[in-house]
Amino acid sequence: MSRATKVVLAYSGGVDTSVCIPYLKNEWGVKEVITLAADLGQGDELEGVRKKALDSGAVESLVIDVIEPLIKEYAFPAIQANALYENRYPLATALARPLIAKILVEAAEKYGADAIAHGCTGKGNDQVRFDVAIAALNPQIKILAPAREWGMSREETIAYGEEYGIPAPVKKSSPYSIDKNLLGMAIEAGELEDPWVEPPEEVYGMTKAIADTPNEPEYIEIGFERGIPVSLNGQEMGGIELITKLNQIAGNHGIGRIDMIENRLVGIKSREIYESPAMWVLIQGHRDLESLTLTADVTRYKRGIEETYSQLVYNGLWFSPLKGALDAFIQQTQERVTGVVRVKLFKGNAMVVGRKSDNSLYSFDLATYGAEDEFDHKAAEGFIYVWGLPTRVWSEKLRG
């Protein structure tokens, strides 16, 4: 029995999504498979994707450049939210998934497809991100996930593909699964599945080993307008150029490497290796500029919801009502987050060592201990008495 007639398949050119093409046609009775690959700035990974899809049995192969919306509509809001999943992961992969889901739905509607398919397994987070985002954008469209059902091991998947002329792309000497876009890389599988094993240097593609980084620090200046990075070292530039250059600069100093045990949505712990040089530096710089321009209560409240925001993105709820509500709050907080931060890059560390803003709430005359001090020291005694009054009353009652 046919699962669908015409399917738009999220396509990467890898073995799993390539095998999906003959599998959908031969096992599930799909008549036409249209592949869609998103150009997210992953570079040469997309070379030959169109030809490979057509050779694997697709009737049409689409490659859509979405680098600019990835930066403007997904990365920049995440920077404004200081989004770090479990305080470490800048969400490079997770941010791309709702964007891919969006263009999949648009393509399905344009080509009259009755289903969308992806090659995610039943063990990872991406299946959730795709399914939930697609359902949010078009609840009527059917979602097919062959890899969730076919029950084939990695070796069996490769063998199935070879029956239909699909070559295995992963050599025994390089068993890693890699997801890359302009925001960063995610590396897993192979020996990395042992959390005790140090990742070999060969897995990294965006950052230098600390031993190979410069022996002198490099200082950079990042300009922000309303929480969005707009300049690097005094030169205004668009988001793509800025992140590309900052990836190179920060990566040269070994910044942005993350080795973590992360809690997946499906209930398991996973060892993940990430590289995200630019996003790491931008979030550190943005967070510091907020400390200069936001009031204490707004800062504390915003810090409290940043982890919630990160969890929503990680868990595939980009298009959820709560995410929309948090976006509205965050945008309001960014009205005055404009200024420049100076960052010292050295041996894997990005340290903010200077910040300035026309909206700065820092008052030298109030903060200084020098002769210019204008703080009313005498007012402190009354403030302390009132501030500590509840504790004083509690203590008196306790002592009887």
UniProtKB/Swiss-Prot annotation:
Q: Which residues bind ATP per the record?
A: A10, Y11, S12, G13, G14, V15, D16, T17, S18, A38, G119
Q: Name one Pfam family in it.
A: Arginosuc_synth
Positions that bind L-aspartate = T121, N125, D126
Q: What is its main location?
A: cytoplasm
- Keyword terms: Amino-acid biosynthesis, Arginine biosynthesis, ATP-binding, Cytoplasm, Ligase, Nucleotide-binding
Catalytically driven reaction(s): L-citrulline + L-aspartate + ATP = 2-(N(omega)-L-arginino)succinate + AMP + diphosphate + H(+)
Q: Where in the cell is it found?
A: Cytoplasm
Q: Where does L-citrulline bind?
A: Y89, N125, R129, S177, E262, Y274
For this protein, the record's SUPFAM superfamilies field holds: Adenine nucleotide alpha hydrolases-like, Argininosuccinate synthetase, C-terminal domain
**Cross-referenced InterPro entries:** Arginosuc_syn_C, Arginosuc_syn_N, Arginosuc_synth, Arginosuc_synth_CS, Arginosuc_synth_type_1_subfam, AS_cat/multimer_dom_body, Rossmann-like_a/b/a_fold
The source's superkingdom equals: Bacteria
What the entry lists under PROSITE patterns is as follows: ARGININOSUCCIN_SYN_1, ARGININOSUCCIN_SYN_2
Recorded GO MF terms: argininosuccinate synthase activity; ATP binding
Q: A Gene Ontology biological process annotation?
A: argininosuccinate metabolic process
| This enzyme's EC code(s) | 6.3.4.5
- In which family does this protein belong, per the annotation? Belongs to the argininosuccinate synthase family. Type 1 subfamily.
- HAMAP family membership: Arg_succ_synth_type1 (MF_00005)
| Protein name as it appears in the record | Argininosuccinate synthase
Please name the source species.
Answer: Trichodesmium erythraeum (strain IMS101)
Q: What are the top taxonomic ranks of the organism? A: Bacteria, Bacillati, Cyanobacteriota, Cyanophyceae, Oscillatoriophycideae
